[in-house]
Amino acid sequence: DRPWVIKDIRGGKEQWVYYCNTDWYHEMFRDEHPVQQHSISVSGGSKNIKYFLSGGYDRQTGIMKATEPDVFQKYNMRAKIDAKLNKIMSLSNNMSFYSSDYSWIGVGDIQDVFRNLRHTPASFPLFNPDGTGLYNNPLIIGGNYNVANGRQIVFAMGKHKNYDKKFNFANTTELVIRPVKQFNLTANFTYRRVNRNGMGRTVNIPYGIRPGVFGAYTTGAGLNELEERTRRYDYYTGNIFGTYEDSFNNAHNVKVMFGFNAETYRYKNVTAKGQNISDELLNDFDLIVPDPSTGAKITNLEGGQSEYALAGFFGRVNYDYKGKYLVEASGRYDGSSRFAKGHRWGLFPSVSAGWRISEEPFFAPAKKLVNNLKLRASFGSLGNQNVKDYMFMRTISIDDFKAFTFGEGSTKAQYAGISAPNSSSLTWETTYQYNLGLDASMLNGRLDFTAEAYIRDTKNMLIQGNALPSVYGEDAPKENSADLRTKGYEISLGWRDSFELLGKPFNYSIRASVSDYTSHITRYANNPDKRLTDYYVGQRIGDIWGFVVDGLFATDEEAKDYQANVCDALTYVGTNRMQGGFLAGDLRYVDLDNKQEGEGGINKITLGDNTADSPGDRKILGNSLPSLQYGINLGFDWMGFDFSTFLQGVGNHYWYPSGMNIAFWGSYSYAYYTAFMPRDFIKTVWSEENPDTYFPRPRVYSSTGGELAPPNSRYIQNVRYLRLKNLTVGYTLPQKWTKAICLDKVRFYFSGENLAYWSPIKKYTKYLDPESAYRRVTKKSNDGLYQNSDAKDAVAYPWQKTIMFGIDITF
């Protein structure tokens, strides 16, 4: 009952003064939300006609505590019919329909509210005592801080509406003609339409400045604006191919297939914006009113369209001798309009061979133990034409001068501009893969084992070309100038069996799998010096370079001695980030190369030449790609009860949190990033009374440009985990019961998703899911220090635990 907000005279005016302890996440998000899933299917037919029809509806209510919660709805339907027209012809049609609708209250994308709540101090309430929203007043950091950027007001108003609607329709019609037993001719055509429409509406955000004085946020999130977006995708695909299959002398089996494929893709988008909508509840461009200052309506319309075509010939030949020796050769010859003439066509052959060792006479003594043993090897190539449309040509665009007019009137002058230079020699990126595998089945099929190793070479990857002269004023065009080699393996082991339990069969199974891979750059044309600011030959993809830290300074004297003899200042840290120099509780960096940087002063903690061969005092601390990925499936059924579970995990996955990841750094990022500070955070922070802690001396902005910003060995995290991905328990009623009510099968079940996980990251924060703790390799700083940084790694929609109860009924 304490007065969390009081009125007081400050600066000669009556003001609100805040002494709150608000849990902003609890106030803005709910812990539980309902989920619905419904599905139905019908199948049947006769000797010559068979049909299948299914449909489903899903509805998920989100976690937002707005006037209207965020809601996702999905409808799907599938209809298939197969008809035998006569002795040699059959016709089938397969149609699918999918529609989804996601609506939410907010500004822009759904992650917006997470971004803004990160920096909301608990000392502020959501609203003032008079009911007005809290946004800004002179007492809040001198009037220079906006509480939650007004997102709690947005939730309460319910007028910032957004939706994203998707519609997906696909239909495939196929005709098969079989004039003789050994040969058939197949022709099919697929049409797919995808529509995606979206809307975003923002309105002015009113708030209270002080008692009786009000303001409004009218820019950015508070701009009175309506935006509507529409996207349309059309796909046309046709295939015609013939297949010949025959056997000779009960030993030789041959299958030959050859065909032609053609695809066309068209895309169009339109985005319209308008400001000054006359009604906050109605969203229509007809309600735009002129801007009072100019007398003109503020609108913007933009869009574009593109298309590409793909054509190709394909074929495959299979041969086996008594099911013992197996050979397959296949290939594609594809052409894409995304490349210039002379570079459009690519040939992509593949070949594989298998040897069923268990069919050899010499293997007969072991066949009771090993029922099937197969050795296989393959080589294959695959083309990739996923580049932007028209990338090989320069395009011309027309735009208006924003501030210049010619002649009388207000019509803006127009100009034409040409795009940056492109390489006309762009062509297919090609992947070559070599596989070696072993399949085994033992103990009458109860135990099975599969192992496979592979090497994948990706050739002619697109990268930025050699830099053009600076006077040219444009970036270099992209070229096919990089190669990548990936090596990996996959292993799977399974066991299934049954035994009698209380006179009833108890069937059970267990399966475990593990896989791993590494990727290295084998060619990269534009970085011969191996600068750490870019990719380089020999680099393992995902490597994290960082400094080595061997602890925290115990005393100020120890810190000053280090500053006098090892490093007087960290040149890559902003001067305002370490005021007072090194002090007790700061990180003690290790001088790995014993080299001095520059003239004057003492600085042995350096970046060296910033290359892989001369990285200064940095080394590779770990790798940001997950390794040793594994999964375990367990299941059994007995007397109508069934149980299954799936555990999934990663053996190693190194990650260095970005500066604004408050779930890990808390107030080390920004002083006012306290909305999600862990309750026991102060116990983990260094102080003279508590020196043996994990986190260092509190310094504002430490993780956003300070000593914690560059990756280091102390705070790099191994976010390996084991997750209980799914657990399902069901019970099927005895058939004698269901038959009595004219039903074939009735099953009740419970299912849980993401029920629990185990990870070492829990030792330092329980608010961070290991699968959301990752760094996208999207941008590198000029000095290469933040080569894996991504400020958005803490604002994804939270991982959710799902618990479902359901019933399956079969008629």
Where are these regions (language model features)?
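Short Pro/Gly-enriched beta-strand edge/turn motifs at strand-loop
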Residues: V17-Y25, T299, A612-G616
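Transmembrane beta-barrel wall of Gram-negative outer-membrane proteins
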Residues: M28-I105, F169
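Extracellular/periplasmic, surface-exposed regions of secreted and cell-surface proteins
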Residues: K80-S99, Y145-T202, F214-V548, G705-E707, ...
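Glycine-rich, aromatic-lined ligand/substrate-binding cores of catalytic
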Residues: R577, G581-F582, N623-S658
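A generic beta-sheet turn/junction motif
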Residues: G44-N48, Y57, Y321, M442-N444, ...
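Surface-exposed beta-strand-turn/loop segments characteristic
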Residues: D1-S41, F52-F72, F127, G133-R151
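Conserved small-residue
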Residues: D1-Q15, V107, V270-K273, S498-G622, ...
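C-terminal beta-barrel architecture of Gram-negative outer-membrane proteins
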Residues: F646-Y721
